[in-house]
Curated annotation (Swiss-Prot):
GO terms for biological process: cellular response to water deprivation; chitin catabolic process; pattern recognition receptor signaling pathway; polysaccharide catabolic process; response to cold; response to light intensity; response to salt stress; response to wounding. The gene is CHIB1. GO terms for molecular function: beta-glucosidase activity; endochitinase activity; lysozyme activity. Changing residue 173 to Y: In strain: cv. Ci-0. Changing residue 299 to V: In strain: cv. Bs-1. It is found in: Secreted, Extracellular space. This protein functions as a defense against chitin containing fungal pathogens. Belongs to the glycosyl hydrolase 18 family. Chitinase class III subfamily. Changing residue 22 to T: In strain: cv. Ci-0. Changing residue 169 to S: In strain: cv. Ci-0, cv. Ita-0 and cv. Pog-0. This is Acidic endochitinase. InterPro entries: Cts1-like, Glyco_hydro18_cat, Glyco_hydro_18_chit_AS, Glycoside_hydrolase_SF, Glycosyl_Hydrlase18_Chitinase. The lineage of its organism: Eukaryota, Viridiplantae, Streptophyta, Embryophyta, Tracheophyta. It catalyses: Random endo-hydrolysis of N-acetyl-beta-D-glucosaminide (1->4)-beta-linkages in chitin and chitodextrins. Induction: Expression of the acidic chitinase gene was not detected in normal, untreated plants nor in plants treated with ethylene or salicylic acid.
Amino acid sequence: MTNMTLRKHVIYFLFFISCSLSKPSDASRGGIAIYWGQNGNEGNLSATCATGRYAYVNVAFLVKFGNGQTPELNLAGHCNPAANTCTHFGSQVKDCQSRGIKVMLSLGGGIGNYSIGSREDAKVIADYLWNNFLGGKSSSRPLGDAVLDGIDFNIELGSPQHWDDLARTLSKFSHRGRKIYLTGAPQCPFPDRLMGSALNTKRFDYVWIQFYNNPPCSYSSGNTQNLFDSWNKWTTSIAAQKFFLGLPAAPEAAGSGYIPPDVLTSQILPTLKKSRKYGGVMLWSKFWDDKNGYSSSILASV
């Protein structure tokens, strides 16, 4: 091999190494999850997904279920499930999925009447969710024939009993040919008082921790350490594929925990993205994101 040929090989090798070092790691890339459904002025599902800013959409909320109650979907001003006017969102769910966006049905929320009375009750609820929102069959599917990607646990009321049974039962449906994603939105104090047992089942794919309305474990007045300590506790204690930093999309969206976009992108995300379990950012909610433009401000850094 001539000296000139050797020099060319060395140059190509160094160029390859420099490109490899400068390329962002796939592990550090994240997506944005958004809650949609609780304000009729936030646009429809198709418009939400067409923004190109979101990788996950949680349709919120199924507010009533369990203990023999007739399940009730509440989509605020978007439609009236009781009058069967929400079925047109089925085509919009499919539109989102065609863009590679995962769409989940979110259970619970801060207002509602939900609980699980027993292991048998958990199975009844799981069967209802399978037949009405997932891959099963029912004549009364609230969102039409769309097959959602999974179920989100946003449990903020009631008893901690049997949410683990529901998670285990739902996960079994994945064996029917299509993956059923399980996601959860616990409060940042660890362990979550209502969802702790469910999250310990190791059945959850994504966990978007609510780092707001809980000052001891969220950002406040330039203090990032409480948030970092809580993040580390969650990511080292719970066996989930990915964890997300859950935030209010505007100061008015929560009582505390709002992080200015420049602080998030410069002081917080660079640290969180070092975690191999980092998945991205979750925002509450689409309505507040529209008002404040938060996702647009942070998207390139997520």
